Amino acid sequence: MNLVELKSKWNDVLDLLESRDRIAWIAYFDARLASLSDDVLTLHFVDAEKLSGAHDYKATRNDRIRGALEDAIKEVTGISLKIVEI
């Protein structure tokens, strides 16, 4: 799978994530998919940082929340990815 293919399925990933864990969805719904290399998906939050005001969701994106996103990606796409942030 390449980044373009993953982007085409991203709304399905987010919909599944929202149905399972609304906190995880809030933490990731405004992420930008920056790159996909091997099994590593890099997410960028520049827009989220500009618009979040006093809310800092970075601390919310802990191992459990990140794992929920990784699980949703695997279920929708069939591939296992590690999530990193820039």
Model regions and ranges:
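Intrinsically disordered, low-complexity basic tails and flexible linkers associated
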Residues: 1-86
